[in-house]
Amino acid sequence: AACDQVDILVSFITHSGVRKLLDVLQTATAIGADDQPRTRLRIITTTYTGATELRALDELARLPGCEIRVSLDGRRTRLHAKAWLFQRQSGFGSAYVGSANLSGAALMGGLEWTVKFTERGQSDLFEHARAHFETLWEDSEFQPYDPANPQHRRALNEALRQEAGQGVMAQPTYFDLQPKRYQQ
């Protein structure tokens, strides 16, 4: 396999972004001769601002060997990181860290920056990125998502609706503002 495991950390995942990469991801995660996915795929994302799309996660979850974890509380966990770690048992892993979410706009037309570093060339940095991903993966803030589980679907759908501002009545905020002496 070109890669043994891919770990993806992005704030938002949209259907347009998944469609751009689906063929590559299907090839990478295809079942091999040993009846196992050739590449394990782990994804961490959020419901922050309601930008992640349910159907995008559903499509990814159908890939063999794909596991997804989602923070359902966009107000508490403001994950803004974007990183892709390609891990290889050979020790020739690589990572891409930048500004692009997994969306069509970011992948195709956005003005995004991405930096690549390698396990061999920048081993400390690569290990730090890998360890940070593992820490987030094990954090209970990021809940497993299985589209076949009705509770998971309901919780994710509700979190996305709330983050997008649907069905939530905005509470007015009142301030007692007083100008500073130099502002009068």
Q: Residue spans of the language-model regions?
A:
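PLD/PLD-like phosphodiesterase catalytic module centered on the HKD motif
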Residues: 1-181
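Pre-Walker A adenine-sensing motif
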Residues: 184
